């Protein structure tokens, strides 16, 4: 019974009808949750309602994001105002210690920064008001609209469930059966009641969403107008102060800061002290480069002398057998790499160097032969007429070239080997006289190798002045015996 004493419609419904109504409503909820396709005509009838729901969800999300942005903005304003105020105080403190024009500029700029920091904090007042209004709007207007939408969704689910129920009953409808017609009329009445409730809530939702959007626009326009007015006033005052400082400092001379030591009144000019320092630093750098290059050159010459001594000692150990096998060595050398004009162009400078030092090498070998009693001293003394031509000829090839260069012209190497073999044979005879008519065929003593080696070492005499010239061409045992 209701308040007027009339029976309610629910009291006349049986338990079976309530169960059936609950069943179809649950089936509609399941269809919506699983995302199954519904009747396209039924969905098209709710297109306007769905558009209003999208607007509501957009308003709800934007209000939440706006609250977060306002909080971050207030925090950033406080931080930048604090940093600006500290910079202004620092400039004012430094201006008290400086009585020059720079001190005046720093004092004026520091005062402007402190004033700007205080005025920037004034922006927090309209922002706080905006935040409060947005929070109130979200808590009341948006929440009330959300409650209405939830009731509307329940009514729509119930209405669509009743439609499914009526569709199922209509498939079993038989006009000749009075009982089935009565059942269809009851289901049809349920559909009409649910549709009326749904239409009423649908209208309420559409009206509240429209009112929600309009109220949000009014709120934001009022709050943001206050914020905009405050922001424009802040920038106008700050720009005015900065322009006044700029106009006051127009007559001041600019300063060039050099290593943060002192201020200069004449821009684009470097002081004499700095020039001297730069010149001194440049000279020191160049001197260091020269010293390093000399050390590297001396180190390379020492390494070359050591390698050459090792190669010469190996040649002395092998002796004549080395020359006996020289023809085979010449045959094994690649002919393509030994022939041509490239070798003569690359190593032509050695002939000039060795020929220029031939006279000095002959004097040095004579002193060595006199000091150590070489048996071939008499032989070399008997040949003064040969002069510079044999020495020049012998200085064109050094035994160490086989180790340093690793390749030679095949023909020239074979000629040299044949000459050496003939000379070794002549050195073992009883000092036979050499005819003067054939100056090209020379008899060489074993000390000619030492003479050639001394000429080779004279090339490095300037690079390594500390080496012992008496030790050239002799082993350690011979020096100890001497």
UniProtKB/Swiss-Prot annotation:
Residues 44-247 form the AH domain. One of its GO terms (biological process) is spermatid development. Transmembrane segments: none annotated. InterPro entries: AH/BAR_dom_sf, AH_dom, Islet_autoAg_Ica1/Ica1-like, Islet_autoAg_Ica1_C. Coiled coil: none annotated. GO terms for molecular function: protein domain specific binding. Residues 366-385, 428-449 have a biased composition (Polar residues). SMART domains: Arfaptin, ICA69. Pfam families: Arfaptin, ICA69. Residues 365-393, 427-449 are annotated as: Disordered. It comes from the Eukaryota. GO terms for cellular component: acrosomal vesicle; Golgi apparatus. PANTHER family: ISLET CELL AUTOANTIGEN 1 (PTHR10164), ISLET CELL AUTOANTIGEN 1-LIKE PROTEIN (PTHR10164:SF5). This is Islet cell autoantigen 1-like protein. The lineage of its organism: Eukaryota, Metazoa, Chordata, Craniata, Vertebrata.
């Amino acid at each position: 019974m209701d308040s007027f004493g009339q029976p309610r419609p629910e009291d006349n419904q049986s338990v079976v009808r309530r169960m059936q109504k609950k069943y179809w409503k649950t089936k509609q909820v399941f269809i919506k949750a699983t995302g199954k396709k519904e009747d396209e005509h039924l969905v098209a009838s709710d297109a306007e309602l769905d558009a209003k729901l999208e607007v509501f969800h957009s308003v709800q999300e934007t209000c939440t994001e706006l609250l977060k942005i306002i909080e971050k903005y207030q925090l950033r304003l406080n931080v930048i105002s604090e940093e600006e105020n500290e910079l202004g105080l620092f400039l004012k403190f430094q201006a008290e210690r400086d009585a020059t024009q720079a001190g005046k500029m720093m004092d004026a700029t520091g005062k402007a920064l402190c004033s700007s920091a205080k005025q920037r904090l004034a922006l927090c007042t309209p922002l706080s008001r905006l935040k409060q209004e947005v929070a109130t709007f979200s808590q009341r207007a948006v929440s009330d609209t959300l409650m209405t939408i939830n009731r509307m969704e329940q009514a729509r689910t119930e209405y669509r469930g009743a439609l499914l129920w009526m569709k199922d009953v209509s498939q079993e409808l038989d006009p000749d059966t009075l009982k089935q017609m009565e059942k269809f009329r009851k289901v049809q009445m349920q559909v009409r009641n649910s549709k009326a409730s749904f239409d009423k809530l649908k209208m309420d939702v559409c009206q509240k969403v429209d009112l929600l959007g309009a109220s949000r626009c009014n709120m934001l326009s009022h709050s943001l107008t206050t914020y905009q007015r405050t922001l424009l006033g802040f920038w106008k005052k700050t720009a005015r102060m900065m322009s006044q400082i700029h106009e006051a400092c127009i007559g001041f001379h600019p300063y060039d800061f050099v290593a943060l030591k002192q201020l200069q009144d004449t821009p684009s000019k470097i002081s004499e002290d700095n020039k001297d320092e730069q010149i001194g630093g440049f000279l020191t750098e160049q001197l260091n480069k020269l010293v390093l290059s000399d050390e590297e050159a001396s180190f390379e010459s020492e390494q070359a002398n050591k390698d050459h001594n090792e190669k010469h000692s190996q040649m002395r150990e092998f002796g004549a057998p080395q020359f006996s096998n020289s023809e085979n060595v010449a045959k094994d050398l690649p002919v393509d790499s030994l022939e041509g004009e490239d070798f003569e162009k690359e190593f032509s400078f050695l002939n000039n160097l060795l020929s220029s030092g031939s006279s000095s090498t002959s004097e040095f070998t004579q002193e060595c032969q006199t000091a150590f009693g070489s048996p071939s001293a008499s032989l070399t003394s008997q040949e003064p007429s040969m002069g510079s031509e044999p020495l020049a000829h012998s200085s064109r090839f050094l035994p160490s070239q086989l180790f340093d260069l690793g390749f030679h012209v095949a023909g020239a190497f074979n000629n040299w080997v044949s000459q050496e073999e003939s000379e070794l044979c002549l050195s073992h005879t009883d000092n036979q006289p050499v005819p003067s008519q054939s100056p090209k065929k020379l008899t060489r003593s074993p000390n000619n190798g030492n003479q050639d080696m001394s000429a080779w070492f004279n090339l490095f005499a300037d690079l390594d002045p500390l080496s012992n010239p008496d030790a050239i061409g002799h082993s350690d045992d011979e020096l100890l015996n001497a």
